[in-house]
Each structure stands twice: as C-alpha cells, then as structure tokens.
C-alpha cells in the first residue's frame, strides 16, 4: 500500500514485514537467559532498550525515496526502525542505490537491515542486475548444485556491494503443476530438486555473507491463488506437509538459513482460526519439529488479498505516516526473545564492519 505523507510528493509504503513476536512465560531475565543461553548477551541488550526501540526492531517498512529525504530520516529515527525493504521504484542506477543504502546507515541506523526481493525471472527490483533473467525455474531445470551455488553467490555479492544485506529468498515452494502461480518462480515441481537447489542457494548466500530468508512457509506451491490477491486455503495434515512442503525448508534450515518468511494461508488441520502468518502453532512446528532457532517474519501485511474471505488483520492505514506507525505500534507487545533473535542476526551480519 502506498501512503502519501501530508499530501506532498514524497510517499511511503508502510508495513512491509512484521517480525513475529512470541510470548514466553519466564518472568525474570535470569530465567529467560537460562532457557536461551545462546541469546544471553542479546537478552541483556534488549532489557536495556526502551519499548519503542524494541518495537522498532520488529518492524520492516518500505520507503518511496530514491534520495533519502529529511522527513523520511526523521520518521525512521524517531520510531527506531531497524529494517527497510526496497522496491524497483527506489532504484535508478548503481550510484544512486549505493548512496541510498549508505545514507540509511549513516543518518538513520548503522545496523539497518536492508532487504530486497531479487529472485531472478519474474521478480526483480534492480534493473541493472546482470543475473536478473535467470529465474529459479531456469536454475532448477539445470539441476546442477555447482551452477546454483555460483549464481546465488554472485547475486549475493552483487547485492552486498549495493549495501543490501538481506535477500528474501530462496523460494522453497513446490508447485503442484504449471497452474500454480509460483510455477515460474519456483525451482521445480520435484521435491528433491527443490530441496537440493534451496540447500545450495543457502550455502552460497551464507558464504557470501548475506542474510537468507526462506519463503513462503509452510509452502504455497499447491495453490493457484496468490495470497496477495486472495486468501488461499490449503488443508493438508502435518504428516503430508512433512513429506513434501516442509522438506526444502528443513534443508534450508540445516544449511544455515537465519530467517523464514511465513505466508497468508490457512490450514484447518494446524490452526482452524488463524493464518500461518499469525499462528503460534506454526512457530511451534518450526522451533520444535524443524529445529529452527532463527527469526520468523510474515509476508507483507498490506498485501493480504481479500481479507474479508479470511481474517481481518486490523490494518486501517491513512494518509499520515506518523499515525500509521503509531497505529501499528499501539498493540505491539515485543517480547524479549523475538527482539534478542533479531539483535543476534544484526550483530552476526554487521554490514559496516564487514565492509571495513
């Protein structure tokens, strides 16, 4: 959704991605640190943060700027926003894009997470990407692990050079057939090929130093409906999902993926009320059954299709960006562990330190 700020030319798109915040029963810092010893130092940092700083960690937004404006800087800084997602309208050329990402870190947050969808094929945000015409399907058709590693590594280095340190990919979905809206964006209809390509892609991305985001959990391939347009329902028992849809995600997790993006679909066998993007049941599956300890994020909350057919996400944005952020912040209750996990990813992927 595009939001006009105070009816001037500059525009903002607000709410791109929400980091899912889980609730834990441990009341004291000591108890929480004992539960999550690998997050201990980040838990200490979270306890020293203000409520606004914690909320800012858990929200990623899109901006309309090509050249970072003072107004955008003010909004992002005031609300302690830690994540930005870029789209094609943010991109003019290499020099301009490098300055935009550099300015975001210089004037807003030196540890800013800057993300992009740069899949290749149908989905590209950067028109001068030399690899943009190589789609996941092209890669899957070759079914060559060395080839996919090479492409993923080169693309990751290309993005990092532009100041982008987070890529929304690889796609782990397994399309049922050519009728799936993800058919051309996916590696293959074959489970093993998808899993192999995902594993090699994640290894390349991690070797290059970019943050990996597996998508779209729990698997969006077995539908002809785009969740950005409508509200798909895929009713499969968890045993079925484990034997198919979950396989590429598990391979990506084992290869070192740091984030997983959930989609807006519903499955009555796992949660008969909430979609994946809002359901704790799926988080439990990821953490307990699939041994994922990283950050779980949702797909775009302003692109949830015909929500009257599914669930009302409670998003009611207007023309004032300040009010919109206040609106989204109002009911956010960022828990310690969610914030600590994001801090861990930021710390382990310090863009400026690596650049030096």
Feature-to-residue mapping (PLM):
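N-terminal hydrophobic targeting/anchoring segments and the immediately downstream early-domain regions
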Residues: 24-128
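Active-site mouth loops of central-metabolism enzymes
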Residues: 58-67, 136-149, 230-244, 302-304, ...
């Amino acid at each position: 959704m595009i939001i006009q700020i105070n009816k001037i030319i500059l525009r903002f798109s607000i709410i791109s991605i929400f980091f899912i915040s889980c609730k834990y029963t441990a009341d004291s810092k000591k108890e929480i640190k004992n539960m999550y010893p690998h997050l201990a130092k980040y838990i200490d940092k979270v306890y020293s943060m203000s409520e606004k700083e914690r909320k800012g960690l858990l929200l990623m937004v899109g901006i309309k700027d090509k050249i970072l404006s003072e107004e955008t800087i003010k909004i992002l800084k005031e609300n302690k926003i830690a994540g930005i997602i870029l789209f094609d309208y943010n991109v003019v050329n290499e020099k301009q894009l490098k300055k935009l990402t550099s300015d975001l870190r210089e004037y807003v947050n030196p540890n800013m997470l800057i993300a992009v969808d740069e899949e290749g094929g149908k989905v590209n945000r950067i028109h001068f990407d030399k690899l943009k015409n190589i789609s996941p399907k092209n890669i899957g058709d070759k079914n060559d692990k060395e080839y996919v590693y090479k492409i993923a590594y080169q693309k990751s280095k290309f993005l990092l050079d532009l100041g982008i340190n987070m890529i929304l990919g690889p796609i782990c979905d397994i399309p049922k057939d050519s009728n799936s809206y993800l058919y051309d964006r996916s590696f293959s209809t074959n489970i093993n090929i998808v899993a192999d390509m995902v594993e090699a892609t994640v290894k390349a991305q991690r070797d290059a130093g970019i943050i990996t985001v597996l998508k779209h959990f729990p698997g969006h391939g077995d539908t002809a409906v785009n969740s950005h347009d409508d509200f798909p329902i895929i009713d499969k028992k968890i045993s079925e999902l484990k034997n198919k849809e979950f396989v590429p995600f598990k391979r990506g997790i084992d290869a070192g993926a740091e984030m997983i993006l959930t989609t807006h679909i519903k499955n009555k066998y796992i949660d008969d009320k909430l979609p994946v993007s809002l359901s704790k049941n799926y988080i439990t599956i990821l953490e307990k059954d699939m041994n994922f300890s990283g950050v779980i994020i949702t797909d775009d909350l302003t692109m949830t299709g015909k929500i009257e057919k599914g669930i009302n996400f409670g998003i009611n944005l207007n023309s004032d960006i300040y009010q919109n952020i206040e609106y989204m912040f109002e009911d956010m209750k960022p828990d310690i562990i969610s914030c600590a996990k994001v801090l861990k990813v930021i710390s382990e992927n310090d863009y400026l330190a690596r650049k030096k």
